[in-house]
């Protein structure tokens, strides 16, 4: 039972405050609806590791689970505002932490803010595209994947591998049609660049493979 587990992990965390022991103890407190202890634990973890973003998200999650949604929203908002001097790894960590608690809109906010801050140093296209795809915004997802090729053609293999997984290349597939339409427009707008021509040839080859199967 969680009553026994919380005693065990409390001792374990006291002797060894590792990430795993913290996570197990926090889960026990939340399962027992002991929100005061959970909050104290998470806030203590934030003090010990102020640059680790996901512990700050834990504090907001505890407010949410205890029924104080407005306090949780304020906490999340405060975390996003604190990103002004964040590193790429902190932005990625925070975006992932929000996605893990199904706060995808907040994760998008984090990645868009990160993109403004670091520019082409790290564009966050793959993270944004994945969320847009989960939300059913396939057009937005494809746009993100194709945009990243303007930053570096070195991403082409990653883009192709990902699109291969998420797009059905049969002729009837609307996603396939959106991809080809976007590629044609980009070829017209950027005739001097051959990256989109390469992508279109690749897309047609995938369709041929699908039809031959």
Predicted regions located by residue number:
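TPR alpha-solenoid repeat register
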Residues: 21-22, 55, 89-90, 124, ...
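Canonical positions in the second alpha-helix
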Residues: 11-12, 44-45, 78-80, 113-114, ...
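TPR/TPR-like (Sel1-like) alpha-helical repeat modules
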Residues: 47, 116, 133-157, 164-168
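Structural register within alpha-helical repeat arrays
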Residues: 25, 59, 93-94, 98, ...
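Register position in tetratricopeptide repeats
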Residues: 31-32, 65, 100, 134-135, ...
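Short coil turns that delineate tetratricopeptide repeat
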Residues: 16-17, 50, 84-85, 118-119, ...
């Amino acid at each position: 039972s969680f009553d026994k587990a919380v005693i065990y992990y409390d001792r374990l965390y006291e002797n060894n405050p590792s990430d795993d022991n913290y996570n197990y103890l926090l889960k026990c407190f939340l399962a027992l609806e002991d929100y005061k202890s959970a909050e104290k634990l998470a806030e203590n973890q934030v003090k010990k590791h102020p640059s680790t973003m996901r512990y700050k998200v834990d504090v907001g999650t505890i407010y949410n689970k205890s029924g104080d949604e407005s306090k949780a929203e304020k906490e999340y908002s405060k975390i996003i505002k604190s990103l002004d001097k964040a590193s790429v790894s902190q932005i990625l960590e925070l975006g992932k932490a929000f996605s893990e608690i199904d706060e995808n809109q907040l994760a998008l906010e984090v990645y868009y803010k990160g993109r403004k801050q670091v520019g082409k140093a790290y564009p966050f296209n793959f993270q944004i595209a994945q969320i847009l795809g989960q939300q059913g915004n396939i057009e937005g997802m494809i746009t993100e994947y194709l945009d990243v090729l303007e930053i570096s053609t070195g991403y082409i293999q990653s883009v192709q591998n990902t699109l291969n997984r998420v797009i059905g290349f049969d002729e009837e597939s609307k996603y396939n049609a959106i991809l080809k339409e976007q590629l044609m427009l980009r070829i017209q707008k950027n005739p001097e660049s051959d990256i989109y021509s390469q992508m279109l040839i690749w897309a047609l080859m995938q369709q041929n493979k699908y039809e031959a199967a």
